[in-house]
Curated annotation (Swiss-Prot):
This is Uncharacterized HTH-type transcriptional regulator YbdO. Gene3D superfamilies: Periplasmic binding protein-like II, Winged helix-like DNA-binding domain superfamily/Winged helix DNA-binding domain. It comes from Escherichia coli (strain K12). It comes from the Bacteria. Residues 27-46 bind DNA.
Amino acid sequence: MANLYDLKKFDLNLLVIFECIYQHLSISKAAESLYITPSAVSQSLQRLRAQFNDPLFIRSGKGIAPTTTGLNLHHHLEKNLRGLEQTINIVNKSELKKNFIIYGPQLISCSNNSMLIRCLRQDSSVEIECHDILMSAENAEELLVHRKADLVITQMPVISRSVICMPLHTIRNTLICSNRHPRITDNSTYEQIMAEEFTQLISKSAGVDDIQMEIDERFMNRKISFRGSSLLTIINSIAVTDLLGIVPYELYNSYRDFLNLKEIKLEHPLPSIKLYISYNKSSLNNLVFSRFIDRLNESF
């Protein structure tokens, strides 16, 4: 049995703050995730240092690193805090969150999005809110840390102590044009293709930038006559003009009959896009969420 008198003398909130500092290795980021000031985090760390008679963290380069005592404390604390959180969730099982917020690029609407939604909706009580936003891995981590999203889909892996990230899907790109294009045929040469005007997706995402650099090398000095931040806008513009564009194959396949589009065959395949799905490790303590992840893993 725990010594409740000794526990009463110790502020258990300090251990939560310690674990948050350990996860981020940053006073300021720990403060952001806990919605308190960096000063409050620093004061709590000072109290812990006095309690354990150890600095717990020391400066390392531009950041901080845990001492051996800090490492040992985290080793034991992580399991105990997870167990405490699971106990609270079990007691409040009826109040567990069942509204899932997903952030991801428009690309998911034409790939494995249906699989995600299907896995979530196997629990009929789940409500889903989906935001079509292309973001960096850093912004994705911030959304997860601040609990503003349950699932985030990115084109670059999210690397964080508190986040689980895994590959979701690889999207093949293809070059398309209108089925009524007056010059492009199945036998069009590279030179004939390069004589046409192209569309381009506007994006600041590192993943898209890398792909566009490869495409720029492949179609060097091509003329870009239409730029847009929406894939649906781009594909609709291609359908009603003589423009050529590079879009995800699944998107083309979904709309080719309705919009009278055709694929332009190339000698070598275009670069593909990898998608990653990320979520907080602590979310697995939620029974509804953990079951969803199990279903998702079974679908791969």
